[in-house]
């Protein structure tokens, strides 16, 4: 019996050793950052067209807040913000396209939720825009609050948290309504414009953008009610922690740059600074780039290419844009908002 046990143990150990040696001999799967470097460009998923976030002009040039984030990531890697391909995705396509590897990064006004992380195997790399769901009506409806939307027809994009929030809010307030769900945001807007429904619900930032597409924007009113928290941010697959960490810190770098007063126009001064926190940011001290798999100048390259968070916001969404959305919660924590980034240390 004892000899049999010893033989079994020796056999088991031999098998384990063989498997270990075989595994060690297999080539390591390339991470997303290595794949992007080898390809020579970043594949970034964006919306099909949302003013302020991602839109393509007649010449095929992309612009917007989400688009600029992709360019910041490309600049951090390649020192060239043009080394990115934009892949337009609908709400129903976006997460599956990311999971399938059709894009490296999703920067597409997507809300961070538990279900999306836990069930879909995705990781949200922080928040780039704190939003909330609202309602747009035609002035002829005369409502002044979402609580006055009883017996209305409401257009909503299917397969979104917006659709779920709508049901929760109206049922909890005993409001009867007819939901009109559409596969795309464009279809929902078209139905609202044609009068098939008299209410359109989306994130408030999107409603500001959609109103500009109407023949007479002044005829539409965005109600003051905000019925949800919609933390929007870039998304990666959860099977590549190194890539997730890189994308997350590109996000944080833009916020930290605003706090430090580093802009797209003063990077030369930042590089000559003697302040320890600025020197760490520009890569003159510390080995933070190496920790991310790139060189130490990654953060300053991103800011030089697209600007700090304030520059991104004001150019695409704020006072310098067509939308004119106040920063509100998206102001720095030191300025009355909740925008906050960990230190680069």
How does the language model describe each region?
Residues 2-16:
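Bacterial N-terminal signal peptides that target proteins for export
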Residues 30, 34-109, 292, 297, ...:
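Extracytoplasmic small-molecule ligand-binding "clamshell" domains
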Residues 43-52, 62-77, 111, 131-183, ...:
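Bilobed "Venus flytrap"/periplasmic-binding protein-like clamshell domains
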Residues 67-77, 139-143, 147-161, 206-207, ...:
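Extended ligand-binding regions for polar small-molecule ligands
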Residues 71, 75, 79-148, 204-227, ...:
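Acidic, polar ligand-binding/catalytic clefts
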Residues 84-96, 179-194:
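Short helix-initiation/N-cap motifs at beta->coil->alpha
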Residues 288-345:
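C-terminal functional modules
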């Amino acid at each position: 019996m004892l000899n049999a046990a010893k033989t079994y143990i020796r056999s088991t150990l031999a098998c384990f050793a063989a498997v270990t040696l075989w595994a060690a001999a297999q080539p390591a799967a390339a991470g997303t950052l290595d794949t992007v470097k080898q390809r020579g460009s970043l594949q970034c998923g964006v919306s099909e067209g949302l003013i302020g976030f991602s839109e393509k002009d007649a010449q095929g040039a992309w612009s917007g807040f989400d688009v600029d984030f992709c360019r910041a990531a490309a600049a951090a890697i390649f020192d060239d913000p043009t080394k990115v391909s934009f892949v337009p995705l609908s709400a129903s396509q976006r997460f599956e396209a990311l999971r399938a590897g059709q894009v490296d990064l999703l920067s597409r006004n997507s809300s961070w939720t538990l279900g999306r992380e836990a069930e879909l195997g995705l990781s949200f790399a922080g928040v780039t825009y704190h939003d909330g769901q609202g309602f747009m009506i035609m002035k002829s409806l005369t409502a002044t609050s979402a609580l006055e939307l009883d017996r209305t027809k409401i257009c909503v994009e299917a397969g979104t948290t917006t659709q779920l929030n709508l049901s929760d809010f109206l049922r909890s307030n005993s409001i009867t309504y007819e939901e009109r769900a559409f596969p795309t945001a464009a279809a929902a807007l078209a139905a609202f414009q044609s009068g098939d429904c008299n209410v359109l619900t989306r994130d408030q930032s999107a409603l500001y953008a959609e109103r500009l597409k109407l023949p007479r924007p002044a005829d539409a009113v965005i109600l003051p009610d905000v019925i949800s928290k919609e933390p929007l941010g870039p998304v990666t697959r959860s099977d590549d922690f190194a890539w997730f960490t890189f994308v997350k810190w590109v996000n944080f770098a833009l916020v930290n740059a605003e706090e430090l007063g580093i802009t797209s126009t003063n990077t030369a001064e930042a590089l000559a600074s003697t302040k320890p926190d600025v020197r760490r940011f520009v890569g003159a001290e510390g080995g933070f780039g190496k920790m991310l798999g790139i060189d130490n100048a990654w953060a300053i390259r991103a800011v030089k290419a697209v600007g700090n968070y304030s520059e991104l916001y004001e150019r695409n969404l704020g006072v310098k844009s067509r939308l004119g959305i106040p920063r509100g919660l998206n102001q720095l924590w030191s300025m009355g908002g909740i925008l906050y980034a960990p230190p680069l240390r």
